[in-house]
Each structure stands twice: as structure tokens, then as C-alpha cells.
Amino acid sequence: MSTLTPGRPYAPGRQGFSSLRAGGLNWDAFPLRLFTKGNAKFWNPTDLDFSRDAEDWEGLNSEQQRNSTYLVAQFIAGEEAVTEDIQPFMKAMAAEGRFGDEMYLTQFCFEEAKHTQVFRLWMDAVGLTRDLHPFVAENPYYRQLFYEELPGSLKVLETDPSPVNQVRASVTYNHVIEGSLALTGYYAWQKVCTTRGILPGMQELVRRIGDDERRHMAWGTFTCRRHVAADDSNWGVVQERMAELMPLALGMIDWVNKQFEVQPYGLDDQEFIAYAADRAQRRLGAIESARGRPVEEIDLDYSPEALEEKFGEEDAKAMSEAAG
């Protein structure tokens, strides 16, 4: 019979428990602040009513429905992809001994799964039940981003969770996929629905998702900031990865636009490109501001959260104006 010796590590090598250490968990640390905030803002996809959306969908013309299907297919496939691909980041945080980040990323992953659920419920409600793979798989830029770059940049963390790889993964996942693509797409779609007074269920689900995603963005900015503060060369990694991926993001949007001779909703693409560029530059500015800062200060610096809250206020104001 084996004898258990207190204090000796056992497979798989756990040394102890963060929750049992003297002083417990630091609830003021940035990741746990986001975790607490997310718990307070819980919402249930099955509580949303999509009955009016089904009626409004039937009132759209065929090109508007086709354009909307491109958007929704990209949204839901993206939410499914990020649900799967965030998981190696949890292991990276475990390897770094950052249990607070692990806690937040479990909530983060759950929320991405919930976003997949709510889009699928909406699609079922309006009758989008056929195979929609062509709406994403035929877009070469979408394929490169979501089939290759996103999973590839996250999967490497399973074997090499170095700061450089964490920064590359965060820029890919948070700043390009979530920030430049998803949140900009949600803003554009929300503006279409609000201006036309249609699809109230979609408007509500996008509002809920956007609130979650801004917390995700805050964590991504925070993660890049702490690595930039620790090693200034990581700022170059941020810039390099953004430069690699932004042409793909713009190409993905342009490819969809070229599937239509006339824009079905009459959107001004330049407005949303400017929106995405403005948000990207302000987030990059938040990361750059960590250069030369003591690393220990970053955990208690809530400026990434404040920035995302500011973005939320700006979006709400824009939607109020769009509604008239």
C-alpha cells in the first residue's frame, strides 16, 4: 500500500491550490474583476423572443436575406471556432500559474458557447436550417483566418506557451477576430436592424453578445499589456501580427461585398472600415501605454476595461441616434 506524504506533489504535478494560499484570491486583480463582472451580467439565450424576427425575415427581399445569411453564418461559425480555440490559452495560464486568468477564461469560453447557442436559436426561428457551409468555406480569406490562422496560433500554446506566442495568440483571437471583425460586424448589423426597425430579437442578442465581447477584448488587451510591460520587444510582436492579419480581415469583408452587384442594405463600407480602424488604434494605444511600466502595476490597472466601457457607451449613443 502506498503512503501519501503531505506536501509532496503527485501526478500530474500539482504543487498546491491558489484558493488555499494565505490571503486567498486577489479579487482586485484584473482577470478576477472581469470574472465577477461577467457573473453579474449573466443572461440566458432561451429567454430571448425571436417570433417577431421570423415575421421580419419573411419581409426581406431575396438579396437582403442572402446578405444576412452571409453575416449570420460568419458570426455563428466564428463563435463556434473561438469556443474551441480559446482552450489552449487556459493551459497556458495554468503553466504560468495564473489561476485568476484560468477562472476568467472558463467564463470566457462558456460565453462563446452561449453565443453559438443564441445564434443557432435565432437561425432556427427564422428558418435558416439548410447547410450553410458555402457561406464561409468559399471565402478564401475567411478560410485562412478561421481554418488556419486562428486555430494555429492558439494550438501552439499547448506545447510552447511563451510570452511571444501568447501575444501572437491574443492579437489573432482578441484584436483581429473579435475586435476588428466580430465587434465591427455586430455594430454594422445592429445599425441595419435599428435604422430599419426590424429584427428586435437580433438587436437584443447582438447587444448582449457585444457586452460579453467587450470584456473578452479587455482581457486580450490586458494580456498583451502585461507581456509588453515585462519585455518591450513584445510590442513589436503585437505590431507585426496585426500587420500580418489585417489584410486578411479586410479581404474577408471585401469578398462578401463583391458577391452583390448592389449592396442590399445600402451600407457605407467606409463608415465601418473607419469604425474598425478607430477601435483598433485605440486598443493598440492602450497596449503601447504599458511599455516601460512595472509589470506588477498592470494587474491592477483597469484602463482596458474602462476603454471597452467607453466603446459600449459610444455604440449605444450611435444606435439611439440611428433609431431616431
Swiss-Prot record:
Cross-link (3-(O4'-tyrosyl)-valine (Val-Tyr)): V82-Y173
Database matches in InterPro entries: Ferritin-like_SF (IPR009078), R2LOX (IPR033908), RNR-like (IPR012348), RNR_small_fam (IPR000358)
Cofactor requirements of the protein: Fe cation; Mn(2+)
Function in brief: Probable oxidase.
Subunit structure: Homodimer.
Protein name: R2-like ligand binding oxidase
Organism of derivation: Rhodococcus jostii (strain RHA1)
Catalytic class of the enzyme: oxidoreductase
UniProtKB keywords: Iron, Manganese, Metal-binding, Oxidoreductase
GO molecular function: metal ion binding; oxidoreductase activity
Similarity annotation: Belongs to the ribonucleoside diphosphate reductase small chain family. R2-like ligand binding oxidase subfamily.
Any one GO BP annotation for this protein: deoxyribonucleotide biosynthetic process
Disordered: annotated span: 304-324
EC number in record: 1.-.-.-
Binding residues for Fe cation: E112, E178, E213, H216
Cofactor binding description: Binds 1 Fe cation per subunit.
Compositional bias annotation for Basic and acidic residues: 307-318
Sequence positions that bind Mn(2+): E79, E112, H115
